[in-house]
Amino acid sequence: MRPSGDEDRARRRRRRRRRRDLLLSQLCFLASVALLLWSLSSLREQKELDLMDLVGEDRKWMMARKLMQVNDTLTSEDAGLRNSKNCTEPALHEFPNDIFTNEDRRQGAVVLHVLCAIYMFYALAIVCDDFFVPSLEKICERLHLSEDVAGATFMAAGSSAPELFTSVIGVFITKGDVGVGTIVGSAVFNILCIIGVCGLFAGQVVALSSWCLLRDSIYYTLSVIALIVFIYDEKVSWWESLVLVLMYLIYIVIMKYNACIHQCFERRTKGAGNMVNGLANNAEIDDSSNCDATVVLLKKANFHRKASVIMVDELLSAYPHQLSFSEAGLRIMITSHFPPKTRLSMASRMLINERQRLINSRAYTNGESEVAIKIPIKHTVENGTGPSSAPDRGVNGTRRDDVVAEAGNETENENEDNENDEEEEEDEDDDEGPYTPFDTPSGKLETVKWAFTWPLSFVLYFTVPNCNKPRWEKWFMVTFASSTLWIAAFSYMMVWMVTIIGYTLGIPDVIMGITFLAAGTSVPDCMASLIVARQGMGDMAVSNSIGSNVFDILIGLGLPWALQTLAVDYGSYIRLNSRGLIYSVGLLLASVFVTVFGVHLNKWQLDKKLGCGCLLLYGVFLCFSIMTEFNVFTFVNLPMCGDH
């Protein structure tokens, strides 16, 4: 049976707490990105010294043609100003004045802006994980949404809130490419870097399901193709932005009927000999197993060794086995003809018996959970065992009764261990959530973290009610509204600091979005996916990384564009400053094909080999995108205007 709602919420809270504990690794990663950007700024300054001498007459002619195309859509006054400057107005002028001058920042004050940006990344992760997402969970419960629809709507908005607000700021405030760059960079990061990190550090080979990956990848590919078509002319109209939003509504409908579509997909692929992963990578399973449910259960148990609950109901309904008299009696007593108390008791007993059968079956596999041997297994009932035939023997001649007895003892010990683990986890959940400003944790490292996050904890403690706590549970709408405001504020501060850093170092806004902003907003999701992959749930890690990209492109870009062109200034266009974005989005499309093709060649398994390949491709994407934006291959960007 599926875990209850309380167990789901407890598991999600533990996952969020573990993400918070990975603060040090997140800071180290962002520091390395900042060091990379500093190196790029040095190369940028060296290149700009003799830029006009190196480009030659052909490059000057291309720049003039670029200016003529832009001036066609500007007023005469703006065109004259743009023509006289031969540069792009920096987005820094759309923000309040900085307390430091550009010279002060070049002398070292920019480090303070880097630290502030990193702190904003962490603040966004805390607000999203501990306040925004729990409030969305409460909303989904009140609306009685299915898991698929809730995941495609509210949960996607919760995980992609920083990217969405960054895009809103890029459209309405900076009027530049920082939002588009962040969405594109975050999308590539989610596909290549997250899958690469999960493959390298999961600690095990994780099997992937073809259905989730193909479903999200196909629709994601259509979304990227639509984005390429719409931004090819460097402007987006109102109907193009509306198409993106409508495509996401279609995606929600697909998720609503995901189960029916999945069944059709399984019926088409089942004839090819695929039972679990949707492809013929399970040929090593012996044909004599006849796709028995034991195979599925054992294969699933291989990745959930410590789980106290296994979803046996769906697997047994899909792959039924011959029932004994006692089993049939238990199943009859869970129907609506009996009182609720009896139904609950019989359902619990049936699940215990099915788990007993799973453990007993594992005793005959000689440690190989990939192969199941079809031997009729006795099921323990309340006062004894069911009817049995002559004593059966295992594959090594061991008497079956002895093995069953040993397996029963192991089951009892395992259940006791699981109960103890659950009690410990429940005790830990009492202390879950963000740090409180008035309770100092124990341990030096925890104290340092508490001191580092004290200003953030102090502000959030008095402004955002924690709906995870029973006394604030009914205030989830207040939590939703206040956390949304804080996400908007932190996103504004984050984009402001990153814009200052890019202007000081001479790096275009789109590059800052593709690298620094994309990494900063996606590192928490990367850590969460790694935790999920270590638990053996590779499908969830990969599906979440690709599914969130669908939201980023269709809603993260489509919604702000639609608001600007339909509500704020009807009939206007969203203009892109950088022609290089079309190349970056093209690389994004290529990364989807390469990733799915690589997973297929790797027999739908997530391992270190696949992880290294994905990380290598991510490095290639960064290098190519940065060199393109710096006009190394062809002219795509006007230089950024200086102070004077």
Curated annotation (Swiss-Prot):
Q: Which GO terms describe its biological process?
A: bone mineralization; calcium ion transmembrane transport; intracellular calcium ion homeostasis; monoatomic ion transport; negative regulation of gene expression; positive regulation of gene expression; potassium ion transmembrane transport; sodium ion transmembrane transport
Q: Which positions carry Phosphoserine?
A: 308
Bias kind Acidic residues: ranges: 409-433
Listed GO MF terms: calcium channel activity; calcium, potassium:sodium antiporter activity; symporter activity
Q: Which residues are glycosylated?
A: 71, 86
Its subcellular locations are:
Cell membrane
Alpha- repeat ranges per the UniProt record: 149-189, 518-549
Q: Which NCBIfam families match?
A: calcium/sodium antiporter (TIGR00367)
**Its biological purpose:** Calcium, potassium:sodium antiporter that transports 1 Ca(2+) and 1 K(+) in exchange for 4 Na(+).
What name has this protein been given in UniProt?
A: Sodium/potassium/calcium exchanger 3
